[in-house]
């Protein structure tokens, strides 16, 4: 049975609040924090430069369409993305190939033509194993998890993407 990301987040929060004896009245306040995430300082400028170079920009996320659209709009980024792909279209989470198929099919492109960025090592590995050109956004100089895949590139900020592409 499929549950969307928001429901899983709520369920996990309920269990965590119970385990740590956190007042249930705080639940909505804590959930609302997901809706006010802000991008890093260089993100908007980098996306604008990529759009000027005519790159197609998209989000591919386990998040729900409602949450993703709200975050993009609240940060003034809605005109910078060509698409927002949510796993809700296929009702299965990454790293299922059905998720990664979405942009490949929509744009009729080869897997390796997709530059797939993430700060999560498991996410980079999933996209890379699918055949995407994976780029790990490693802002904190972390060590890549011991997974069966290593990213094609590693950057510490999105602005470095301009030189890679």
What do these predicted ranges mean?
Residues 1-28:
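A metal-dependent, Asp-based hydrolase signature
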Residues 24, 48, 60, 64-65, ...:
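Asp-based, Mg2+/Mn2+-dependent phosphohydrolase catalytic module
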Residues 28-36:
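Surface-exposed cleft-lining segments at the edges of enzyme active sites
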Residues 36-37, 93:
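Transmembrane alpha-helical core positions of polytopic small-molecule transporters
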Residues 42-54:
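Catalytic-core regions built around general acid/base machinery
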Residues 54-55, 132:
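Short phosphate-binding/catalytic loops that engage adenosine nucleotides
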């Amino acid at each position: 049975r499929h549950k969307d990301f928001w429901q899983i987040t709520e369920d996990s929060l309920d269990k965590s609040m119970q385990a740590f004896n956190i007042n249930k009245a705080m639940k909505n306040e804590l959930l609302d924090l997901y809706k006010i995430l802000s991008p890093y300082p260089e993100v908007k400028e980098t996306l604008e430069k990529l759009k000027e170079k005519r790159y197609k920009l998209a989000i591919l996320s386990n998040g729900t369409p409602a949450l993703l659209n709200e975050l993009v709009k609240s940060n003034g980024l809605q005109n910078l993305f060509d698409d927002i792909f949510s796993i809700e279209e296929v009702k299965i989470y990454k790293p299922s190939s059905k998720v990664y198929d979405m942009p490949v099919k929509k744009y009729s492109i080869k897997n390796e033509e997709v530059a797939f960025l993430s700060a999560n090592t498991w996410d980079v590995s999933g996209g890379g194993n699918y055949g995407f050109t994976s780029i790990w956004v490693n802002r904190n100089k972390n060590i890549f998890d011991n997974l069966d895949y290593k990213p094609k590139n590693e950057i510490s900020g999105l602005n470095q993407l301009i030189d890679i592409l």
